[in-house]
Amino acid sequence: MASKPFFRRRKVCPFSGDNAPKIDYKDTRLLQRYISERGKIVPSRITAVSAKKQRELARAIKRARFLALLPYAVK
């Protein structure tokens, strides 16, 4: 008996859609969901963010770090 191969469901980008949140460097609560506990930016294959939005997200996180809204590293 051959079983059907299992396909993992493709996650949808959380920043696409009508009521999706805007990526803003001042919104630290949103940005912290995409930073690991060590302070590193989480890759898009884990967070399911599209490539364009991942670049925007990384830019916003780096900008927030520069303005001391987010830490560069957590000890």
Curated annotation (Swiss-Prot):
GO terms for biological process: translation. Gene3D superfamilies: Ribosomal protein S18 (4.10.640.10). Keywords: Ribonucleoprotein, Ribosomal protein, RNA-binding, rRNA-binding. GO terms for molecular function: small ribosomal subunit rRNA binding; structural constituent of ribosome. InterPro entries: Ribosomal_bS18 (IPR001648), Ribosomal_bS18_CS (IPR018275), Ribosomal_bS18_sf (IPR036870). PANTHER family: 30S RIBOSOMAL PROTEIN S18, SMALL RIBOSOMAL SUBUNIT PROTEIN BS18M. Part of the 30S ribosomal subunit. Forms a tight heterodimer with protein bS6. Belongs to the bacterial ribosomal protein bS18 family. This is Small ribosomal subunit protein bS18. It comes from Roseobacter denitrificans (strain ATCC 33942 / OCh 114).
